[in-house]
Amino acid sequence: MKNRVITISREFGSGGRTIGKKVAKQLGIPCYDAEIIQEMVKETGFTPEYVKEAGEYTPGSFLSSAFSNRLFGPTNEDILWEHQYKVITELAQKGPCVIVGRCADYILQDKADCLKVFIHADMDFRARRIVEVYGEREQSPEERLRDKDKRRAAYHRFYTDMKWGYAQNYHLTLNSGVLGIDQCVKIIASLY
């Protein structure tokens, strides 16, 4: 069988991570999500927390510009991007898999056997879900959703020059709030 890769990009709270894991389980292939962060930690020596958070900040943002300046060379975020690119490319070359987030849709854009999926849902569905799944209590769920989506979009735009969530950048976009998690899994698995 030819290697097949499914990338899952998603709005925060839409269930994309859960969908990716369920698709992988149903197909009997690995799902890479936190494993990408772990591999980047091994390669760079940065802490897991830093690697995870840096994936949501673009160089030149307030936080990163306080610590580095691109005029003097690549930022830590740039270094992490290079490692992320390498790790995702290597995972896709290993064999069939599902890769969740981390701009994998862009990184693997030239891979002919890659299905690029975007999962989204309306604000109410996502707000309820982050309270149920993550126990969100510190700020309003809607505020956290807007913040996370804004960061993901900026990061994606900075490194890929593509508009995150824009339907034309994906083979398939699914509304998990309307279809439900399990139906999204069935649809994606049927296209494998």
Language-model-detected regions and their locations in the chain:
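Pre-Walker A (Motif I) flank of P-loop NTPase domains
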Residues: K2-E11, G95
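Glycine-rich phosphate-binding P-loop
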Residues: I8-A24
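Short beta-strand-centered segment that lines the nucleotide-binding/catalytic pocket of NTP-utilizing
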Residues: P30-V41
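ATP-dependent small-molecule kinase phosphotransfer cores
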Residues: V41-P96
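Conserved phosphate-donor/acceptor-positioning beta-strand/loop module used by diverse small-molecule
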Residues: D110-E132, E138-K148
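RNA pseudouridine synthases
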Residues: L91, A104-D110
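Small-molecule kinase domains that catalyze NTP-dependent phosphoryl transfer to phosphate-bearing small molecules
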Residues: P59-A66, D78, R137-D182
